[in-house]
Curated annotation (Swiss-Prot):
GO CC annotation terms, alphabetical: signal recognition particle
Gene transcribed to yield this protein: ffh
Record-given protein name: Signal recognition particle protein
InterPro entries registered for this protein in UniProt: AAA+_ATPase (IPR003593), P-loop_NTPase (IPR027417), Signal_recog_part_SRP54_M_sf (IPR036891), Signal_recog_particl_SRP54_hlx (IPR013822), Signal_recog_particle_SRP54_M (IPR004125), SRP (IPR004780), SRP54 (IPR022941), SRP54_GTPase_dom (IPR000897)
Main location group: cytoplasm
Catalytic activity from the UniProt record: GTP + H2O = GDP + phosphate + H(+)
Amino acid sequence: MFKTLTQNLTKIFDKLVSSGILTEAQIDAAMRDIRVALLESDVALPVIKDFIAEVKQKALGQEVIKSVSPGQMIIKIIHEEMINLLASSESETKLNLNSKPPVNFLMVGLQGSGKTTASSKLALRLKNQNKKVLLVSLDTYRPAAQEQLAILANSVQINSLPIVQGEKPLDIVKRAIAEAKISAYGVVIYDTAGRTQIDKEMMEEALAIKKIVEPTETLLVIDSMTGQDAVVTANSFNEKLEISGLILSRIDGDSKGGAALSVKYITKKPIKFLSSGEKLTDLEEFDAERLASRILDMGDIISFVEKAASIVDREEAEKTAAKLKKGKFDLNDYLQQMRSIKKMGGFGSILSMLPGSGKIMDQIDQSKLNSKIIEHQEAIILSMTLKERENPDIINASRRKRIAAGAGTTVQKVNILLKQYKQISEMMKKASKMNPKNLLRNGIGKLFS
């Protein structure tokens, strides 16, 4: 989501670091460049103004001007201020589950914000924490909205309140309250109706629901793709409903990222979760330091390790590592890596969590290693014999023609796969010889140099 902002800030940081001793004029110029980068990313103007003022005040301090590496000191200040911009106390960011059961959560937001998906993701997260969860759809306006929630709930074996056609939202709430008591649910998540825009009727209905439900949390789902409109939306909901926290959806989208940097600062309400993709497991607890590090191209190694640990088969990973140490990496290993990459959201998603990735993200985009390409490559590799997978060098022109026919593709696509395999094979072998500390310190850009 922050690709453009990350790349623009990386260029500014490179200038600062390469300058050696910094003058006040150079710091002023850097602040102007940062201001432009934030404006282009749809960060709200009041946020930019206060952020730049804080950074500049600290950057002009004597300890920075006289430091051995003033450029690095300013980058450190920017990192700290970005954390301050995004952060809330730990007690605020954690989901409040301390009420007497059933604990009620009210999900609000505009239509199309990803609210229903976020409700289901939250339900799955709580189910995995051994909570008995009931999902309740109050959206009687959007066609098939109630059915959508029921399908999502059923896909992960979570109960949803049975649908009664023609029932009004407030009547659904009363039925849900009774069901929660009878069946001893620990958590009830109410998915309210959205609108294409904020209106008086929508807010009055949501307020009436809130009075009956008495939720422990009122969570506003904000679409990160909406830019500065997200701030207006967040303010309106907060004024009328007094929200307790925010969930930012579609953070994996190709948006400018300004919403994430603005909504918390403007509303003074904590960001609790980041939602990405359609998979119900794609919900992560918000961590200001991790996100700030990702935006500033310092990486988010903790998220990377957590995600990898939940997906990668440890035994297979150890086998691959042992082979790499011996300088071996065949097409079976390549296929295994591609499948893991696909599960983790694609190559771009992985790289965005590693330090130094900002400088090579365009290069990675051009490689087009998305999920569909990986599926096509999987079909090509599975059309090869075991001997060909273990010894790619034997794949001559006639073998390539046979493989292409077996995979239902062209020889050109087979050639592209073999070329990418060779490049990644060299990169993997290079990485296996590097000191892990140096790899993290220097960033993954070194692998491509």
